[in-house]
Amino acid sequence: MVNSLGTVLDPKKSKAKYPEARVIVLDDNFNTYQHVANCLLTIIPSMSEQRAWDLTIKVDKTGSAEVWRGNLEQAELYHEQLFSKGLTMAPIEKI
C-alpha cells in the first residue's frame, strides 16, 4: 500500500482497530417487563424473543444487563434508540 506521498505503508501497521462498546440497560421502577422486552426485540438486531425476556429478567434481578456488544457507532445508535423508548441506560462502556 502506498500513501499520497509515495511512502510504502505496512498493511499490518496501518489497519486501525475499530473501538468496541457495550450497551447496558439498568433496572428502574417504572418500565414493565413487556416494554423492556419489546424494546429489545424491535431495536437490537437478531434479538430472539427468549433472549429479550431472559435479559429483561436479568435487568430486574441484578440491576443491569449487557444487551449488545460491538462497534462503537452501532452501540451509540442502539443506546440512543433504547433511551428514546424510555429505558434507563448506563453510559456506553468502551471496551
Segment roles from a protein language model:
Residues 1-95:
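Terminal domain-initiation and capping elements
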